[in-house]
From Swiss-Prot:
Protein name: NAD(P)H-quinone oxidoreductase subunit O
Enzyme class: translocase
Residue ranges, annotated region (Disordered): 1-23
Family recorded in the similarity comment: Belongs to the complex I NdhO subunit family.
Organism expressing this protein natively: Prochlorococcus marinus (strain NATL2A)
Reactions the enzyme catalyzes: a plastoquinone + NADH + (n+1) H(+)(in) = a plastoquinol + NAD(+) + n H(+)(out); a plastoquinone + NADPH + (n+1) H(+)(in) = a plastoquinol + NADP(+) + n H(+)(out)
Length: 87
């Protein structure tokens, strides 16, 4: 904190960390993060809009991936946890 102005210097603060996901959390896919990923290059380019609108529920977490169930009659999917955000 600067003594003269009373303002906090943000350049010294640590970077903001995304909240760790847990089982049962409601999530959606971040379109920008997913579209720039290796997974998007290896998958169909015509993705359903509901994965970007959410909510999906985290069922399992293994390593860097989360199994997500959408509130639709579709199969559960495994998505890299870097590509999903809290709903």
């Amino acid at each position: 904190m600067s003594e003269q102005t009373g303002k906090v210097d943000d350049s010294q603060s640590p970077p903001k960390v995304q909240k760790k996901l847990r089982k049962g959390d409601l999530v959606k896919v971040d379109r920008e993060k997913y579209s720039n990923s290796l997974e998007s290059k290896a998958s169909d380019t015509n993705l359903p809009e509901y994965i970007f609108q959410g909510p999906g529920e985290v069922l399992l977490i293994k390593g860097d991936y989360c199994q997500v169930r959408w509130r639709r009659p579709v199969p559960d999917v495994w998505i890299n946890s870097d590509h999903i955000v809290s709903y």
